[in-house]
Every structure is written in C-alpha cells, then in structure tokens.
C-alpha cells in the first residue's frame, strides 16, 4: 500500500480530522504550518493552500472553535482545520 503524506483525513467514525505532514507523521500537541499542498483523502486538493493549524494531544485537529494563537490573539479554527485568515 501507499503511506499517507501531506493529507487531511478523518478517523473511522468520521468525527475527528487529522493532518499527516509531508514526512508521513501526524501533527500533535500544538501549532503547525500546513505545507500548502495538502490533500483530503479521497477528495483531492483541499482548496486551502498553506496556513496554520492546531493539533491536539490525540493528534486530532482543532476545528470549529476559537483558540489563542502564538502571539495571544484569538483566532477561529475552521472546519477543515485551517486557521481563518
């Protein structure tokens, strides 16, 4: 089979979203930058290029909620895991 790289994917229940970085590793525990080439598994390009995301301790992405960015400003995390611009 093929390893997921640079991909947004859901768990088996379809409730938690994950990002597998270009090295095939799930992001975890904090802020990270999307590569700009990420794909949604089975759907093709996500339509969002780059930007920031936040991964929880279980590797799931923070979605549809407000967080504090590294500089302390409040930001909204969209349903696809990207920080709203």
Which residue ranges define each predicted feature?
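Extracellular adhesion/carbohydrate-binding repeat motifs centered on closely spaced tryptophans
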Residues: 1-85
């Amino acid at each position: 089979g093929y390893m997921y790289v640079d991909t947004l994917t859901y768990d088996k229940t379809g409730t938690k979203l994950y990002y597998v970085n270009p090295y095939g590793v799930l992001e975890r525990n904090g802020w990270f930058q999307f590569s700009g080439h990420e794909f949604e598994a089975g759907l093709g390009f996500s339509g969002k290029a780059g930007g920031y995301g936040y991964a929880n301790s279980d590797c799931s992405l923070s979605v549809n909620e407000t967080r504090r960015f590294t500089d302390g400003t409040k930001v909204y995390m969209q349903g696809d895991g990207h920080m709203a611009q």
